[in-house]
UniProtKB/Swiss-Prot annotation:
Keywords of this entry: DNA-directed RNA polymerase, Nucleotidyltransferase, Transcription, Transferase
GO annotation, cellular component aspect: DNA-directed RNA polymerase complex
Protein name: DNA-directed RNA polymerase subunit beta
InterPro entries noted in UniProt: DNA-dir_RNA_pol_bsu_ext_1_sf (IPR042107), DNA-dir_RNA_pol_bsu_external_1 (IPR019462), DNA-dir_RNA_pol_su2 (IPR015712), DNA-dir_RNAP_su2_dom (IPR007120), DNA-dir_RNAP_su2_hyb_sf (IPR037033), RNA_pol_bsu_bac (IPR010243), RNA_pol_bsu_CS (IPR007121), RNA_pol_bsu_protrusion (IPR007644)
Domain of life of the native organism: Bacteria
Organism (species): Staphylococcus aureus (strain MRSA252)
GO terms of biological process kind: DNA-templated transcription
E.C. number: 2.7.7.6
Record text on subunit structure and interactions: The RNAP catalytic core consists of 2 alpha, 1 beta, 1 beta' and 1 omega subunit. When a sigma factor is associated with the core the holoenzyme is formed, which can initiate transcription.
Role of this protein: DNA-dependent RNA polymerase catalyzes the transcription of DNA into RNA using the four ribonucleoside triphosphates as substrates.
């Protein structure tokens, strides 16, 4: 027997075919969300308050400092927040200190700074009652970038850009005449030497001494019209502020504020880290030949002689000397923007491949401290030096798509940036109030206005592109949404501008971003998924784990290092499936490995690291596809994406053929309930589990406190499916930390169960499975195999109107008693009532405008003291095509103190309707390999082809769907699934390390099946065997969210667009089917004149004709001739508005009057207020 049995959770054993043992457990899959938010609460908030403190007034007398903060208890717990449409948030209280410097008085106060949304344990936020996810954003890291470009004459040119986190960009570029220019903040370009002079290197000789002599520098100096620092400062000021009178002082303060003021310019810690990495000498001298010795500044000894070529070993040896600033120089700059001395490191090297032995100077930025978040003059000089070095052939250009140059902004940082915007707006208000208020009686509370802070947080959670309504179709969809990486959003790319290169798979994605899972369509490659083992480091770069190879013994050690993409570029990495002996040494002399972008074969002595697992390349969703290695990547992409659209079934079933990922994905998704502590189960009910903690002290175990775990029962998920949790533990079980206590939707015994295992035959059947269609047995309908439960929510509000309040009541004008049969005395539908479309759910009346009373009404009013009520019926009805059983009704009243109701609403009623949807013709099904199709026919069980033992098969798929799609994984799954079913086992075939051909065939033999996996099938209609043997097996098939019930739509009359008077489009607007230009051509080609006429008039925008037609149909009369379509009038009006005199003439050249439609012609037109989601105001024609 191939494979070994592995336990997944408490209840499931699987035969696992993996050959490579797991050396590292998968991390918690949603830690990218939870860790980032924890960092924000622990450090991010304090960091921001520190940045903004102190706020001083214009005189410097008052100073406001933010000392400390604390989060209080949330007003509503999680469940209550969802029920009340509230935000799950805690009050943020900040300790603020006001110092009055004149008197030395200090006032301290705790100030309320608004409610701050809290993250749930499962990595989501509840905002206005809805669960939302903050997606991490992939952005360009702040740093110095060098880029190579070819000009129109075919010459190599370079440009460089210093990109900060916030602040002005600095760019260098060359032109056709070999002059180097600089651009400050995207303005017009200046010769580079102008900026150097402005920094204090005033004479030509100083500049040449600094950067070393070369022709580019000489050309630039010739072009430069300035001669000293003052002239350079004035020149820069004129470029940046044209039209303003330049003075030296103004120019200095402008340059200072652009680059050296920490409030205006911020590299952030990641920018400082990347800049130091790029510009420090230790990274730039690699493989260079020295033209001067390197001297230890402290001892004066020569560490490396002139003429030495510095390889990696040599650089490692002298690293300490380089870091302690060997060969450093300090320049005292006078009259420049910054008065402090500038320290740089400079070493002369020989220009590579130069026969004349010329030298060039490599200048480093002398490694400024990581606390320095601004750019320094040393950075600017070093970046210029790098640019000149590139022109001499020293150094590398950057690949912007490399993950070493792209970083993640996770929840914490996105929130911090948003909070910072709010705080800076608040800072302005505080300054203004300081100058107005009386210093004697002033308190911190009076100075601070928290509105801008609250507004910016609300805006971020409510309407940012990165704050998304959680995809809750199934646990995998939840999990993937939390691990999603988007390159879109504020400060990111836009769909239209993103090039092919950005979207493409890059070698640095290996183990960091999934190369397979990305949406099809305009977002392809811009939205990605985090790989299974990847994590995010403190700078926001994605790291992936590798096993370290001992450099002396060349054996694999137990040490696991997490490497970022640019760190990995220095190492040779062996594949996870390299053969090792029992001591961890490579068995082959030549090993398949990766170095930078190349897959090569190298000697085993050259290996530095080895992959931890074959599945570290792919994301959690992709890792759920068995036999992924046998599928084409495009189909695998569809398979990964479609698993997220699977509808939770009534009776879910875990796959016979899994990958071992099902348990982990289900546990971490947040849909299951997991134990927060080790303990013993004391009580189990369908809606609650009680666990007594077991605590170990001094080796003795004793009982601790009791944990309660409430279960969600038949709740509505974000995508309208049923969210229900079922216990899978029994009283007395001892559960470990993080063990699954209760299954969520689409789960079975602690494993993800998105679909069902069904018996599938690859065969055609009367052409019903043409074009990927699926033929299904009626058994799957009868036995509720693919039945799902759907819950829809409808709400009705009673508001205050100008004419009086709306009322929820049973007393509705002009409605028969039979229409009210499901309503209780309040006018609200009973729980358990069965309703169909058009039925009243909540009776509601709205006051009409008061009209002049008739004499009779005045008499009635005088007698009964009440006039006949002028109200119209605005009841909530079941929309077209919906219906089901009323599951729950929630009523919120303002009188009962429901402060969560929005202003103007007195009462809110929510009705939940549940539907049980069996599978239909027209529903979409798929497997896990991108093999999707629509059900074309449901065949009676007795007519389905049957196996030799008489069992009918469940589904027939077209064999032509396999060869051209190249997803052979489905065939292997089919055979292995059948073997597993016959053996009564579950199997796991992990990606890239699963069952191979031999394993599959040996398991088939073990199950007693035919060697080729095929069987004779008999036609259920005739009892005859089919001509050839057929591949029959068990495949895991899912029912997708694209259900025909949601798409079926029909209309006779309905709302019309206001201007063109044509029917609206789309099911949501109850619209019609568009008959477009090409369809008109088709009818013209057939000469179907009358059909064409009625389609373009009565059925579209002939307002008079359609009313008369409706009347004629009702009365059984002949239909009258059509009149002029409204769109023709619109066209005439448009031409007339252009100043053209347009008239319509008949055959006798008499003008036809184009009068507007008279209201008498139309029976009744009313603006349809219920259709509030339609794009324009509609008019509806009623009989």
């Amino acid at each position: 027997m191939a494979g070994q049995v592995v336990q997944y959770g408490r209840h499931r054993k699987r035969r696992n075919y993996a050959r490579i043992s797991e050396v590292l457990e998968l991390p918690n899959l949603i830690e990218i969300q939870t860790k980032s938010y924890e960092w924000f609460l622990r450090e991010g908030l304090i960091e921001m308050f520190r940045d903004i403190s102190p706020i001083e007034d214009f005189t410097g007398n008052l100073s406001l400092e933010f000392v400390d903060y604390r989060l209080g208890e949330p007003k509503y717990d999680l469940e209550e927040s969802k029920n009340r449409d509230a935000t799950y948030a805690a009050p943020l209280r900040v300790k603020v200190r006001l110092i009055i410097k004149e008197t030395g008085e200090v006032k301290e106060q705790e100030v309320f700074m608004g409610d701050f949304p809290l993250m749930t344990d499962t990595g989501t936020f509840v905002i206005n009652g809805a669960e939302r996810v903050i997606v991490s954003q992939l952005v360009r890291s702040p740093s110095v970038y060098f880029n190579e470009k070819i000009d129109k004459n075919g010459r190599e040119n370079y440009d460089a850009t210093i990109i900060p986190n916030r602040g002005a960009w600095l760019e260098y570029e060359t032109d056709a005449k070999d002059v180097v220019y600089v651009r400050i903040d995207r303005t017009r370009k200046l010769p580079l030497t102008v900026l150097l002079r402005a920094l204090g290197f005033s004479s030509d000789q100083e500049i040449v001494d600094l950067l070393g002599d070369n022709e580019y520098l000489r050309n630039t100096l010739e072009k430069d019209g300035t001669e000293n620092t003052e002239q350079a400062l004035l020149e820069i000021y004129e470029r940046l502020r044209p039209g303003e009178p330049p003075t030296v002082e103004n120019a200095k303060s402008l340059l200072y504020s652009r680059f050296f003021d920490p409030k205006r310019y911020d590299l952030a810690s990641v920018g400082r880290y990347k800049t130091n990495k790029k510009l420090h000498l230790k990274h730039r001298l690699f493989n260079q030949k020295l033209a001067e010795p390197i001297v230890n500044t402290e001892t004066g000894e020569i560490v490396v002689e002139e003429g030495t070529v510095l390889d990696r070993r040599k650089i490692d040896e002298i690293m300490d000397v380089l870091e302690s600033n060997a060969n450093s120089e300090v320049f005292e700059l006078h009259g420049s923007v910054i008065d402090e001395p500038v320290e740089i490191q400079s070493i002369k090297v020989y220009v590579p491949n130069d026969d004349e032995g010329r030298t060039t100077t490599v200048i480093g930025n002398a490694f400024p401290d990581s606390e320095v978040k601004c750019i320094t003059p040393a950075d600017i000089i070093a970046s210029m030096s790098y640019f000149f070095n590139l022109l001499s052939g020293i150094g590398y250009t950057d690949d912007i798509d490399h993950l070493g140059n792209r970083r993640l902004r996770s929840v914490g940082e996105l929130l911090q940036n948003q909070f910072r915007i709010g705080l800076s707006r608040m800072e302005r208000v505080v300054r203004e109030r300081m100058s107005i208020q009386d210093t004697e009686s002033i308190t911190p509370q009076q100075l601070i206005n928290i509105r801008p802070v609250i507004a910016s947080i609300k805006e971020f959670f409510g309407s940012s592109q990165l704050s998304q309504f959680m995809d809750q179709a199934n646990p995998l969809a939840e999990l993937t949404h939390k691990r999603r990486l988007s390159a879109l959003g504020p400060g990111g790319l836009t769909r239209e501008r993103a090039q092919m290169e950005v979207r493409d798979v890059h070698y640095s994605h290996y183990g960091r971003m999934c190369p397979i899972e990305t949406p099809e369509g305009p977002n392809i490659g811009l939205i990605n998924s985090l790989s299974s083992y990847a994590r995010v480091n403190e700078f926001g770069f994605i790291e992936t784990p590798y096993r370290k190879v001992d450099l002396d013994t060349h054996a694999i050690t137990d040490q696991i290092d997490y490497l970022t993409a640019d760190e990995e570029d220095s190492y040779v990495v062996a594949q996870a499936n390299s053969k090792l002996d029992e001591n961890g040494r490579f068995m082959d002399d030549e090993v398949v490995c990766r170095f930078r972008g190349n897959n090569t074969v190298m000697a085993k002595e050259k290996m530095d690291y080895m992959d931890v697992s074959p599945k570290q390349v792919v994301s959690a969703a992709t890792a759920c596809i068995p036999f992924l290695e046998n599928d084409d990547s495009n189909r695998a992409l569809m398979g990964a994406n479609m698993q997220r659209q699977a509808v939770p079934l009534m009776n879910p079933e875990a796959p016979f053929v899994g990958t071992g990922m099902e348990h982990v994905a289900a546990r971490d998704s947040g849909a299951a309930i997991t134990a927060k502590h080790r303990g013993r189960v004391e009580h189990v009910e369908s809606n609650e589990i009680l666990v007594r903690r077991l605590v170990e002290e001094n080796g003795v175990e004793h009982e601790g406190e009791l944990d309660r775990y409430p279960l969600a029962k038949f709740k509505r998920s974000n995508s309208g499916t049923c969210y229900n949790q079922r216990p899978i533990v029994a009283v007395g079980d001892v559960v470990e930390f993080n063990e699954i206590l209760a299954d969520g939707p689409s789960m079975e015994l602690g494993e993800m169960a998105l679909g069902r295992n069904v018996v599938v035959g690859f065969m055609t059947w009367d052409g019903y499975n043409y074009e990927d269609a699926v033929i299904m047995s009626e058994r799957l309908v009868k036995d509720d195999v693919y039945t799902s439960i759907h819950i829809e929510e409808y709400e009705s509000e009673a508001r205050d109107t100008k004419l009086g309040p709306e009322e929820i009541t049973r007393d509705i004008p002009n409605v028969s008693e039979s229409a009210l049969k499901n309503l209780d005395d309040r006018g609200i539908v009973y729980i358990g009532a069965e309703v169909k479309d058009g039925d009243i759910l909540v009776g509601k009346v709205t006051p009409k405008g008061v009209t002049e009373l008739t004499a009779e009404e005045r008499l009635l009013h005088a007698i009964f003291g009440e006039k006949a009520r002028e109200v119209r019926d605005t009841s909530l009805r079941v929309p077209h095509g919906a219906g089901g059983i009323v599951l729950d009704v929630k009523v919120f009243n303002r009188e009962e103190g429901d402060d969560t109701l929005s202003p103007g609403v007195n009462q809110l009623v929510r009705v939940y309707i549940v539907q049980k949807r069996k599978i239909h013709v027209g529903d979409k099904m798929c497997g896990r390999h991108g093999n999707k199709g629509v059900i074309s026919k449901i065949v009676p069980e007795e007519d389905m082809p049957y196996l030799p033992d008489g069992r009918p098969i469940d589904i027939m798929l077209n064999p032509l769907g396999v060869p051209s799609r190249m997803n052979i994984g489905q065939v292997l799954e089919l055979h292995l699934g059948m073997a597993a079913k016959n053996l009564g086992i579950h199997v796991a075939s992990p990606v890239f390390d699963g069952a191979n051909d031999d394993d599959v065939w040996s398991t088939i033999e073990e199950a007693g099946m035919a060697r080729d996996g095929k069987t004779v099938l008999y036609d259920g209609r005739t009892g005859e065997p089919f001509d050839n043997r057929i591949s029959v097996g068990v495949m895991y098939m899912l029912k997708l969210a694209h259900m025909v019930d949601d798409k079926l739509h029909a209309r006779s009359t309905g709302p019309y667009s206001l201007v063109t008077q044509q029917p609206l489009g789309g099911k949501a607007q109850f619209g019609g089917q568009r008959f477009g230009e090409m369809e008109v051509w088709a009818l013209e080609a057939y000469g179907a004149a009358y059909t064409l006429q009625e389609i373009l008039t009565y059925k579209s925008d002939d307002t008079v004709g359609r009313v008369k037609t409706y009347e004629a149909i009702v009365k059984g009369e002949n239909i009258s001739r059509p009149s002029v379509p409204e769109s023709f009038r619109v066209l005439m009006k448009e031409l007339q508005s252009l100043g053209l005199d347009v008239k319509v003439m008949d055959e006798q050249d008499n003008e036809i009057e184009m009068t507007d439609v008279d209201d008498d012609d139309v029976v009744e037109r009313k603006v349809d207020l219920q259709q509030n989601d339609a794009p324009e105001t509609q008019k509806e024609v009623t009989d």
